[in-house]
């Protein structure tokens, strides 16, 4: 069983668990900012919701404050009629709540308008516009991380907020996900100094692009480090977080000195994102949370015919449960449509309070838990940094194979953790099974460690045609053959076969490995079959390695075919057999295997919805009960107690022949089975 990670960050304490994030992104068209957020108005509505901490509006992407900033060069929205920051500070202090500021970092439109020389420049020397903006008249609005913006405006304004309002922390938005390579003179000079290359590459086809992209990443990380160090030096105890930094899309050693890790989840269809974030963030060694949007729309942000609507409470509970099971905190984002004067909406605050009670009920059973290692999915930082798919530091990352591996394994009810090389290398022997999903560019150190892991008794699943070159035919027990391009073959599973597409497919022949199944040109199981196996399993030392020579997990993430998930389960069964903990449950149940002290806890999260399958409807409402669930756990001695921690369900258990068998008839949203 794994040891608890030592935290390298800071937080306000265990009881600060559920938060409210409120922001407006104040702009030039506002007219009544701060008019309706007096302490008298705020306090009853905050009590109704009962958050443990609050993040309030400060400076959004337009670069305008919703308070009277006195920092030279600051841009105060012309719509400020009363100082909202002062009112929120008084209200939260009287309620005993920490107050953080929502502060947009790299993305600052007002600073770009005043100081074009501070902004990111494209390869042509022109403005780059907003994130993902490629057409129309592009303006300066994103700051260069090497430019004077940080020292001239951002840090002075943060220090002003600390000194004038005694704020307790900063949640810096518009940072990682707003950054892309900059071609200003500062960056060009630094690039040439670091590399000796005169001209930075203009596009992704240039052989130096990966190096240039990583130069940008390192420049950004240095910028965040500078503001963290400056704030901590000015007033120790003020907490700092950069939105999405050190999360699933930014793997590697979390050495940047932020105090906690956070990111705001997608407003709709965000459940899958949280499934990965929770399993990765719990390996970072820092306090972490995910911010859930309390509202959504069905057809994209900003479309008039798809206005924002409040999420059902149960939708937020379901999204939260995925995070809570892995020991994370949760905050919710509120921005009532049409209200710019600072008002909170009573019926909405009541709803978020209901969600908060659901969350706080789970603190005792979730907080401070650690994983029971079962399946580790490798999310190599070396692979990601060698394969950027775009200019953006967050969105230009190829995470698809890792997502596909996690989702397919969860549907087979394995306990899954996501670890980068930094986290996995020192803990490799803890995990009975490791899956390396098309991580073609993992480090040589990782390859050798995985080979040694197998020789020592571990079980490894690798996928992708390039894995043959990385691990070698002798280790995999196969001989490499033709490399097919844009190929679809059918692989047998269950009572049939599933089509699997791969950009490249290596047709291998077993040598020492045992081939399983045959590739088919059609769904037929007894005709038009190739001699090449669907997958292979090789014994190496005391362990085993399974090899699927195609982009299996990329395909699953794109198509989510149940038969393909069944094929993944077949491969895992041949490779790993029966593990110490096995769960049988409906496919919509996610499992989290955790421990607290000597207690073992099996978390069950219901991802199902009672709403019909409609592509235009992202809501989760009327969540149906699901079951039955059966858990089998190898235990030499009978437990003293087996009980449900959260919901009142029909539970029974027995212990015989060294196996504990637990049966739960049904559960609703989130249940935790506690074994003592």
What positions do the PLM features span?
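Short, solvent-exposed turn/loop segments enriched in Gly/Ser/Thr/Pro and often Arg
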Residues: 23-25, 55-64, 103-110, 171-182, ...
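Aromatic-lined carbohydrate-binding/catalytic grooves of carbohydrate-active enzymes
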Residues: 47-83, 107-126, 179-187, 249-260, ...
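Glycine-rich, aromatic-flanked loop segments that form ligand/cofactor-binding clefts
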Residues: 17-19, 50-58, 83-134, 171, ...
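Carbohydrate-binding surfaces of carbohydrate-active enzymes
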Residues: 2-15, 45, 99-100, 164, ...
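N-terminal structural segment of carbohydrate-active enzymes
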Residues: 2-64, 95-97
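Aromatic- and glycine-enriched glycan-recognition loops and surfaces
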Residues: 30-49, 70-95, 152, 222, ...
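Active-site mouth loops of central-metabolism enzymes
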Residues: 24-37, 139-153, 303-313
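Active-site-adjacent "subsite" loops/lids of carbohydrate-active enzymes
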Residues: 101, 105-165, 200-213, 225
């Amino acid at each position: 069983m794994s040891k608890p990670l030592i935290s390298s960050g800071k937080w306000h304490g265990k009881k600060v668990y559920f938060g409210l994030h409120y922001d407006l992104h104040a702009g030039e068209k506002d007219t009544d900012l701060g008019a309706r957020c007096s302490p008298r108005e705020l306090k009853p509505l905050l009590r109704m919701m009962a958050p443990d901490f609050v993040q309030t509006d400060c400076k959004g992407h337009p670069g305008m404050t919703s308070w009277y900033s006195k920092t030279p060069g600051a841009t105060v929205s012309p719509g400020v009629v009363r100082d909202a920051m002062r009112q929120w500070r008084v209200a939260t202090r009287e309620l005993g709540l920490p107050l953080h500021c929502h502060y947009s970092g790299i993305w600052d439109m007002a600073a770009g308008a005043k100081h074009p020389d501070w902004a990111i420049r494209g390869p042509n020397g022109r403005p780059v516009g907003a994130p993902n903006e490629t057409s129309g008249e592009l303006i300066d609005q994103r700051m260069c991380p090497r430019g004077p913006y940080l020292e001239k405006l951002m840090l002075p304004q943060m220090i002003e907020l600390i000194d004038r309002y005694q704020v307790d922390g900063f949640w810096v938005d518009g940072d990682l996900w707003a950054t892309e390579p900059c071609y200003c003179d500062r960056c060009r000079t630094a690039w040439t100094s670091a590399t000796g290359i005169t001209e930075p590459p203009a596009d992704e086809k240039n052989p130096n692009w990966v190096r240039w992209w990583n130069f940008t990443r390192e420049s950004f990380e240095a910028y965040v480090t500078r503001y963290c160090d400056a704030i901590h030096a000015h007033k120790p105890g003020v907490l700092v977080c950069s939105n999405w930094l050190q999360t699933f899309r930014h793997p590697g050693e979390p050495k940047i000195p932020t105090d906690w890790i956070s990111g705001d989840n997608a407003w709709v269809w965000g459940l899958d994102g949280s499934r990965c974030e929770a399993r990765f963030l719990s390996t970072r060694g820092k306090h972490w949370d995910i911010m859930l949007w309390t509202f959504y729309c069905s057809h994209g942000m900003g479309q008039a015919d798809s206005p924002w609507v409040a999420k059902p409470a149960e939708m937020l509970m379901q999204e939260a449960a995925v995070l809570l099971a892995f020991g994370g905190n949760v905050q919710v984002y509120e921005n009532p449509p049409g209200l710019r004067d600072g008002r909170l909406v009573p019926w909405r605050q009541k709803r978020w309070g209901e969600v908060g009670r659901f969350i706080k009920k789970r603190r005792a059973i979730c907080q401070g838990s650690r994983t029971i290692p079962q399946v580790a999915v490798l999310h190599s930082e070396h692979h990601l940094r060698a394969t950027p798919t775009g200019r953006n530091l967050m969105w230009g990352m190829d995470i698809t194979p890792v997502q596909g591996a996690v989702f397919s394994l969860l549907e087979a009810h394995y306990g899954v953790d996501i670890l980068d090389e930094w986290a996995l290398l020192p803990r490799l022997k803890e995990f009975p099974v490791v899956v390396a999903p098309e991580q073609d560019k993992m480090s040589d150190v990782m390859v050798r460690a995985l080979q040694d892991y197998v020789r020592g008794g571990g079980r490894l699943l690798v996928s992708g045609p390039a894995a043959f070159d990385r691990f070698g035919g002798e280790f995999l027990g196969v001989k490499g053959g033709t490399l097919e391009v844009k190929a679809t073959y059918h692989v047998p599973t269950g009572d049939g076969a599933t089509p699997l597409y791969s950009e490249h497919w290596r047709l291998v022949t077993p040598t020492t490995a045992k081939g399983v199944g045959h590739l088919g040109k059609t769904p037929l199981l007894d005709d038009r079959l190739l001699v090449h196996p669907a997958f292979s399993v090789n014994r190496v030392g005391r362990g085993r390695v399974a090899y699927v020579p195609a982009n299996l997990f990329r395909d699953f993430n794109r198509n989510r075919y149940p038969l393909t998930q069944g094929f993944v389960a077949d491969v895992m069964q041949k490779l790993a057999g029966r593990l110490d903990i096995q769960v049988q449950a409906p496919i919509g149940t996610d499992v989290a295997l955790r421990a607290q002290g000597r207690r073992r806890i099996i978390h069950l999260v219901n991802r199902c919805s009672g709403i019909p399958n409609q592509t235009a409807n992202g809501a989760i409402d009327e969540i149906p009960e699901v079951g039955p669930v059966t858990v089998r756990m190898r235990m030499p001695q009978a437990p003293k107690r087996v009980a449900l921690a959260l919901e009142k369900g029909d539970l029974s258990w027995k212990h015989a022949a060294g196996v504990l068998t637990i049966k739960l008839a049904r559960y609703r949203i989130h249940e935790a089975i506690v074994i003592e």
